């Protein structure tokens, strides 16, 4: 009986989180159906263009609960980039940022915020999306100018 209840709780949480994300996207001026995308690792995904970066909002299954992740591709590295200097700089930036962190995936520099969807509300979804898109837009040109590479993916 408890596994059925747990499954229903997950399904209810997922449905309400999709509604929250789509309400947040609408409030930010985006049509959720128009920016919905496929991501094989996510239950649901949307892509938001802002400036030269592309931000992906995803809902992913984790052992304990579903998680909301907001991830912007800030820049793509090439062979000329001094990775050690860039990575040291990104770590320094991480210490000054609120609620987000720079990360890498292959040759891409990402800016990521993530949290459980448990007790999530609209203001938190809006804040995560705004924070990631704003920080990505503020830092992408500066990072590419200083270290090389190219903007976005």
Question: Can you describe what each PLM-predicted range is?
Answer:
Residues 69-108, 112:
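Short, internal acidic amphipathic alpha-helical interface segments
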Residues 40-76:
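Hydrophobic-cavity lipid-handling domains and compact docking modules
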Residues 101-133:
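A short, solvent-exposed beta-edge/loop patch
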Residues 1-54, 104:
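Charge-rich, low-complexity N-terminal segments
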Residues 6-9, 71-76, 121, 125:
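Short histidine-centered catalytic/ligand-binding loop motif
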Residues 143-153:
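Short, highly charged C-terminal tails/helix-capping segments
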Residues 11, 15, 80-81, 119-126:
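Ordered, soluble secondary-structure elements with a strong preference for glycine-centered loop motifs
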Residues 134-138:
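Long, contiguous binding/interaction regions
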């Amino acid at each position: 009986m408890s596994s059925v209840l747990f499954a229903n709780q997950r399904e209810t949480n997922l449905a309400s989180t999709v509604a929250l994300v789509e309400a947040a996207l609408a409030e930010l001026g985006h049509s959720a159906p128009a920016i919905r995308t496929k991501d094989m690792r996510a239950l649901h995904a949307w892509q938001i263009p802002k400036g030269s970066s592309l931000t992906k909002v995803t809902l992913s299954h984790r052992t304990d609960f579903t998680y909301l992740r907001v991830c912007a591709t800030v820049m793509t590295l090439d062979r000329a980039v001094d990775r050690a200097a860039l990575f040291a700089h990104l770590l320094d930036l991480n210490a000054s940022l609120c609620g987000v962190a720079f990360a890498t995936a292959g040759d891409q520099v990402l800016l990521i915020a993530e949290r459980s969807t448990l007790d999530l509300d609209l203001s938190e979804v809006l804040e995560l999306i705004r924070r990631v898109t704003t920080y990505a837009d503020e830092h992408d040109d500066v990072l590419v100018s200083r270290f090389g590479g190219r903007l976005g993916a």
